[in-house]
Amino acid sequence: MTALPTEADVAIIGGGMVGVTLALMLARELPQLQVVLVEGQRFPALDLTQPLPYTAGFDARNTALSRRTVQAFAELGLWQQLQPHATPIHQIHISDRGHFGLSRLRAEEEQVESFGQVMENAWLGVVLLAALKQCPSVTVCDGVSVSALQTLAE
């Protein structure tokens, strides 16, 4: 565990897929910022050949990633690692069983390759956390909780 810094430009509380992705995007777009990512649970040691052991947010559940999210991961240089573990969404069926109305969307009819991708959270976690370790402007503090924050005027 890294000691919690006393000051940072940005503090991200929560190291799930959204928090880690935000940290990666900030490191890429605004590398001059000092970012602190705080996660209550300990992150496991990474072995890219193995799925993560249970970690909140990076477990055996699956997540549907929108086309824009897939594009963001490509911009971060991560999609090449993620793609072999992804399944494209070609069709969406929307209904409220027992009630009037439904909608069916087909990627082909919308002239898009897919609406997004479905991926197991565990592999997404492996790739995101490995990328995070390569970001010198992000300090990761795992296994800690935040009880208070103070904002400072510049």
Descriptions of predicted regions:
Residues 30, 76, 135-136:
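Acidic-histidine catalytic/liganding microenvironments
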Residues 2-18, 36:
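Beta1/beta-strand and adjacent pyrophosphate-binding region of the FAD-binding site
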